[in-house]
Amino acid sequence: MDVTSYKKPEYFRNRELSWVSFDERVLNEARDKSIPLFERLKFISITSSNLDEFYMVRVASLKDQVHANYTKKDLSGMDAKEQLAGISKRTHELVQLQYNTYNRSAVPSLEHVGLTIISEHEKLTKEQAEYVDSYFEENIYPVLTPMAMDSARPFPLIRNKTLNIGALVQKKEDSLLSRAEDKKEKKGKEKEKEKELEFATVQVPSVLPRFILLPQDEKTGQRYVILLEEIIERNIGKLFLSYDVVCAHPYRVMRNADLSIDEDEASDLLKEIQKQLKKRQWGEVIRLEVEDKMDKRLLKMLEKEFDIDEDDLFRIPGPLDLTFLMKMYGLDGFDEYKIPKYIPAAVPALMNEDDIFTNIRKGDILDRKSVV
């Protein structure tokens, strides 16, 4: 008698790749035009937060297996390296689809209903620019902590999941000299000039809202928002007064946040958990997100410092970290583009009773005509 074995790899699907398919289904909700616009924004945000957690825990665990030379295959017949290769391919496709949805559907739809997201600070009107610069001076500048790297200062520790702006800066006297060079000598000086460039970074403060509402257009009624990182980029020269800013671009890292705790070996489980939670902020960098138009010199420096492979580098064609869309859902004036709030039906039979249990004992409440 021929007995079929159901343990063959072809009968199983890898758990991690299956999860990526799940997150893609979440994103598909954001692409469904039958769902109200602001509800679709929430699904884009959820896709982002899901992917962050997936990388910090599941992908991190697989990388730990690779570092430990653990080669055992899972039920689908894939070892850790094969799973990581498959995950990289699928998640890059997912992120591309996510930003296609954001750029081609969400942003134009928001503008159509009266809300414009200003994606580049160069597109600000004169009045908007004045408002933004004033907001920077009064609210943002006091909470910024710029950090630089040079021969005396190592590369700063970048915290997990934080949004940062990296910059290449050059001392002003060096910059003036380089501009005064003869054109014939300029090409020969390029390598020397690049050596003079220094790396600087500033964290986008989480204590401030991710997006700022700008004054409403009185004629059209159109409302405008700009992201916090765009305001900082516009004014980043004010943080480095002795330098010329050559370029500035946002970036973001995901670190290994998988907890590895041996409950049997830990003498104090609570202290061990607290210790592991602190380490999560400084674990190995497993994913780097950068603006797709980032300067190649800056990108090369980040790749080197974070020791990132091409598989774990995500070039983003839009704002990094789309979880801010969840906060945008709370904006007033767009209720018609949201699912109406559920209002539970009142039960008159229970409204005027001092003791509802006495009333319940009289019979099934749902059978009474006074329920609605």
Q: Which positions does each model-derived feature cover?
A:
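N-terminal localization/anchoring segments of enzymes in phospholipid and broader phosphate metabolism
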Residues: 1-372
